[in-house]
């Protein structure tokens, strides 16, 4: 699976949110293919690798600011809107609503003459309590789910489809992989586990996909995607407990049967963590909205993307091995305490 270099060579492309996990991998692949890339992002850290990637043009701005969005998109043939706020707790919840609603409207106005690849999420596809696998045509049944990330991503998708422009919507799974410069939510979970801080498995399950393959899938969506259509760009469906087994194997630890937290205990932990966060100002982990997500199995299939785009992700075990190697190279701290005894080889 690879994008067509002839399609991208010399093409002017804007990547909104190009310093985030997915956006960064899209930018890297575009540069490797010879694209002329402009990135719109909030000020990145001084050590972010975007500073060393030539010949990327970095525009500092905010999706909520229409002028900076117009500047970033001006003259570009293709626009990837990978800018988003991913949060299940705290002050970022209000920001998320502004970015996903007002920011999407700003992008649609500025990209009226370009092909827009709108990055959504599998959360807009839906989930079940039974593990049923869903696709792009499955009815959405979580309209009453009180999770702001799900609600605002659905709103953004509805705005995109209502615009009747040259837009392709992608629905990536939960992203895993190396080269995670700003440490995504899934990346933080992996690091927390490899540091011995996840002794039991949360309930629920996810579709987990390699960020590198999903980035390639976005390029293929720009090349071959049908206007007005959604494409799930996923990987493998696993319970969280099974995912932890894969993380353990990548670290060379002996496999363990992880106890799965019952829902009531997960909710009690979330209540306690949110109460503590009011005093410490630190992230509530888990939060109540995060606990609501973990009531479900977010299982999907990518058959349409495979058929129409040529999307073909690698096995998840290879992804996790690469991810662990990257974290070790970044100085991942060793196990400690009781988890060192529990997980030792």
Predicted regions and their residues:
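Conserved catalytic-site region of short-chain dehydrogenase/reductase
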Residues: 88, 122-132, 175-179, 184
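Conserved Rossmann-fold NAD(P)-dependent oxidoreductase catalytic core, especially the SDR/UDP-sugar
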Residues: 99-150
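Substrate-positioning beta->alpha
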Residues: 155, 185, 202-222, 228-229
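Conserved beta-loop-beta element that borders a ligand/cofactor-binding pocket
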Residues: 120, 158-178
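Mid/C-terminal beta-alpha module of Rossmann-like enzyme folds, strongest
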Residues: 217-285, 302, 307, 318-327, ...
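A conserved pocket-lining segment of Rossmann-fold NAD(P)-dependent short-chain dehydrogenase/reductase
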Residues: 142-144, 188-209, 213
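NAD(P)H-binding glycine-rich loop region in Rossmannoid oxidoreductase-like domains
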Residues: 46, 54-102, 110
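N-terminal Rossmann NAD(P)H-binding glycine-rich loop of SDR-like oxidoreductase domains
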Residues: 13-33
